[in-house]
């Protein structure tokens, strides 16, 4: 096992005695893994009022791999036995587990497990001890990629003046992916543009006049200054105004609001189902509610509504500031407004963006005090990628944004 000298210390180096079990990977281990019946006495079903006494029940658990990376899995009890189910196939895939290898599990309490993987020679899989997540390199068909090509692919795409471009899946009539180019234009003093810390990730959506059918032009930065002055700091920079930025080319779902647009990759149906299963497997003796994040919750509007039955029973009937404690322990103050639709308002946007919430993610709001929630986040896609903010800007050739 790796020891000192720069290598990761084994997570098993602990003097505390904790329950263990091991499993040889055979049969349908890629889909689910059975937990030994005699070990199930350590699983705290009795702490869940809904699961206690039921023949079939589920609960969420955390599985830590050899590298320290964690996976969310579901423990499901059925008539056949108790299994790791949803989330387990992802662990198998990410750790590149193979038949006849075996895994030793240690139970750390509070539905947390730590896993150690051994190969067919009965030796520990030291390739999984690295901090990068433990994935084995996957070979692809075709010519091998050079190191330079790999680095270039990892870099964000940029235009001719070095501005990062965000590519959307929607395409204009020309068939090319729609790209929105980051602009360094800043509004005049006293304008109504929002000025806060969120503007750092803000991208303008340029609206070109309908009569503009000319090819892409390069406009000197100084020409875009509202006062017609020289270019800022005398820098000889140019900005490219592409016709594919015309407002008509942007999907209605994007241009209808001054909100945020996701930059995550395409999401598979199985990933959405996994997040749903894990979130609904959550159990706690405290009051809680499970809410799927919609576009209104995380991209625009930013009003998060509670189920009426939950809020009327557990929350005050007057405006009050409540505390949201995210999975990292950070505390957020959010305004709660009771009305016909009880909701979180001011401060919710900061929480949603600060935690990179996306449509389809699940939040479990666990009420730990009169006005304090512990928020558990179950994501559709890991790792989280911050969304980008859009604001509408009309550009007339030779004149500044209006």
Curated annotation (Swiss-Prot):
Q: Name one GO molecular function term.
A: DNA binding
Q: Which PROSITE patterns match?
A: B3
Q: Which SMART domains match?
A: B3
Superkingdom of the organism of origin: Eukaryota
Region: Disordered; residue ranges are 126-203
**Which sections of the sequence are annotated for DNA binding?**
18-121, 289-381
One GO CC annotation, please? nucleus
The biased composition feature labelled Basic and acidic residues covers 152-162
Q: InterPro entries attached here?
A: B3_DNA-bd, DNA-bd_pseudobarrel_sf, REM16-like
* Biased composition range(s): Polar residues: 173-186
Keywords associated with the record: DNA-binding, Nucleus, Repeat, Transcription, Transcription regulation
Name it.
B3 domain-containing protein Os01g0723500
Q: Where in the cell is it found?
A: Nucleus
